[in-house]
A protein has these predicted regions:
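Glycine/small-residue-rich hydrophobic helix-like segments
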Residues: 245, 254-284
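Extracellular loop and loop/strand-boundary signature of outer-membrane beta-barrel proteins
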Residues: 184-187, 235
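Short acidic-hydrophobic sequence patches enriched in Asp/Glu that either
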Residues: 191-194, 235-242, 279
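N-terminal alpha-helical interaction modules that lie
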Residues: 1-184, 192-206, 273-309
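TPR/Sel1-like alpha-solenoid repeat signature
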Residues: 167-170, 198, 213-216, 246, ...
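Alpha-helical adaptor scaffolds
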Residues: 205-255
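Amphipathic alpha-helical protein-interaction segments enriched in hydrophobic
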Residues: 211-216, 258-269, 299, 303
């Protein structure tokens, strides 16, 4: 994943099933594990994507792909518009990328997002990060995918400093990468402060960004879990009350989200331990009872169900 595009080749790759023109990364994505709960159940074809968009994107407040929303994004971030093909080309690619993402076809979502150019990097990066965190079983491949996403997002926020979801996916990728190289190692390398700073930028641009609040809640909880309550507060500014504050904010913004609830339950255990075991189990129960709207929500419902058995 990178920010130098051959538009024609990228567009052809998004419509083809293979061939020698595929990049090494695209070829590796063909071996990605499939979403384990069916590839059609969360496929929002035709107008279904638009009619369900508000529910699907309540957590990140991303605008539905259209000529108007694309124009507003580029007005706010002019560097995104350099050499951009017309909306008649880009908008369908973005719609299809998001369809693939919500359906759990994460490799296709990456390919189609990349084909749309820098404006497609949010969906591409999010698809790759979700795949790596939830489905990739090989540790070295998981770290490699997340490292690529971090590098892409670091470049994206330079092009689009006023795009809340560019900052959000950057924070998501940094957080997942930190988890997989070990939180302690990540803190030593300065990633902890960067995760917090990046997610705070997302919230500053979009105060109703529930997913960014989740990311910040996870950050505080994981630092506390790894270095202890006192060291976390003194050295990294991580606090138990911030865990609760961020997750309660996320739950108020996106009630009945299994993503919010499952991460809330896990973070409660990390930050508070056995003293809040009952609360964590109750929140896992809430997550398990949710009706998932897309592949990521289904993965988190299944996770919660496993915790309640």
């Amino acid at each position: 994943m990178h920010l130098t595009f051959d538009w024609g080749a990228a567009f052809r790759r998004s419509r083809q099933s293979g061939g020698p023109a595929e990049s090494d990364q695209a070829n590796r994505r063909r071996s990605w594990k499939r979403f384990p709960y069916g590839d059609r159940i969360y496929r929002y074809g035709g107008t279904a994507l638009k009619s369900n968009w508000a529910r699907l994107h309540r957590g990140d407040r991303e605008a539905y792909p259209s000529a108007e929303s694309l124009g507003a994004l580029i007005d706010a971030n002019p560097a995104l518009g350099a050499s951009l093909p017309p909306p008649t080309v880009v908008v369908p690619l973005l719609e299809d990328a998001w369809r693939a993402y919500h359906a759990g076809d994460f490799a296709d979502a990456v390919d189609r997002g990349l084909a749309a150019g820098p404006v497609g990097l949010v969906v591409s990066a999010r698809a790759a990060a979700v795949y790596a965190a939830h489905l990739e079983e090989d540790e070295s491949r998981r770290v490699e995918i997340l490292r690529d996403v971090v590098e892409s997002c670091a470049s994206l926020v330079k092009l689009a400093p006023k795009w809340a979801n560019a900052w959000y996916v950057y924070g998501l990728a940094l957080g997942r990468y930190s988890q997989n190289i070990s939180v302690v190692r990540a803190l030593a390398q300065g990633f902890g402060g960067r995760v917090r700073e990046v997610l705070q930028r997302a919230i500053a641009l979009e105060p109703a960004h529930a997913d960014a609040h989740v990311g910040l809640g996870v950050y505080h909880a994981e630092v506390i879990d790894k270095v202890g309550v006192m060291m976390a507060a003194l050295t990294y500014g991580a606090r138990r009350d911030a865990v609760t504050e961020h997750f309660e904010a996320a739950r108020a913004l996106h009630p009945q989200s299994p993503v919010v609830l499952a991460e809330y339950a896990r973070s409660t255990l990390l930050a508070f331990g056995v003293s809040e075991l009952g609360k964590a189990h109750r929140i896992f129960d809430e997550a398990a009872a949710c009706q998932p709207a897309d592949a990521l929500e289904r993965l988190d419902v299944e996770w919660a169900l496993g915790e309640t058995e």
